[in-house]
């Protein structure tokens, strides 16, 4: 029986269970699988249970369901999962559906019983740690959730913030260019309002700091993803990050690095929205431009305090899935290769590996179980092999994760990138020619390899030899990405081995 080489490699790459209080340095080498708890896996293991995204109702995903599908996640080489918020939500079915997503909390000291019990959440943490994997939990400090108009909120339903005194006065954000409005006014609308906590008040601040430390400790959490970071004043975040005692990565939904990067001065990392937009635009069609992506890689590298602690992604529950723009599988493979081999921490959204194509929320919140969890789909296999070479490079090169990705050059359809110290570098060649792209040989200069050196292309498991002039002859075909690594460094790795 033939077994995929990345399965053999990943099976052998078991690490010690992580200690608590995982540091930013610990997280640099992780690869994250992001999932909505309600939409990933059910306790009963069903792959047919109905989940109509348009209904916006609970579909039955649980923490126990996740535990039962960790083989599926780890089989792609992921070393961490990020789950949606765990706190108790507003109980009503609103005009916008249920709070299945977890961002309409009402009681921060109780868990969302739809997902399971406290013991179930602890069991998920333990199950991950037994595999040497990390648990990241989504948290919300900016707001609570209310079924009704912002002008008529019953504040007594919120725990522990049970009076209006804990909140900013009611006003909806009208102008996102006004940072005071962004921080002090409310998200939501008069159907579901999101009362905005006044985090400038010591009583609110101290409550959150105590709560987040307890949450991390009680459930052995290794990292936090923080929602709506730009809607809270910056001086709140250093104390929150410190109280958590683990790596914190914030959502700052803005593509301008001049706006987004400074938030890394107040917490460990942020989601890399500055890269998201040019990455999407470069690959969502065969006419996309590489110029903006090339320039933004360099801008983020120079302007953000530490680009190696950012989260790289192209899909999540807030933005349309990549396949909603194009069904070209070659373009999807290039985007996935970029995410995993760029600077920072790769983040793949559940369903991306099955080429899910949901558009705007709620269509992009499909149930993963309806795919049947196949492990032989093209993107599942590509993600597994890309994570495998990244994990291997990290194990062999202590400087890999801190070496900042260098785009070697760009043209209308191609961008090659280099990451890793001399002699151990990975060179990734990305193309947006698409599945109908022609076959040709790219003569690549500037990759840093030596004349006569043999390289393995670890997607197709072929080899090339560096020319006497130092150029690498890279066979390109079908618009597929290429990933090069020194052949001699692969000895004993099982990478590109079928035995």
UniProtKB/Swiss-Prot annotation:
For this UniProt record, give its keywords in alphabetical order, as a comma-separated list. Answer: Calcium, Carbohydrate metabolism, Disulfide bond, Glycoprotein, Glycosidase, Hydrolase, Metal-binding, Signal
The UniProt entry, under InterPro entries, shows: A-amylase-like (IPR013777), A_amylase_C_dom (IPR015340), Alpha_amylase (IPR006046), Glyco_hydro_13_cat_dom (IPR006047), Glyco_hydro_b (IPR013780), Glycoside_hydrolase_SF (IPR017853)
- Where in the sequence is the active site? 227, 251
Q: Which cysteines are joined by disulfide bonds?
A: 51-59, 171-185, 261-304, 461-496
Q: Name any Gene Ontology BP term.
A: carbohydrate catabolic process
What family does this chain come from, according to its entry? Belongs to the glycosyl hydrolase 13 family.
The entry's protein name is Alpha-amylase B
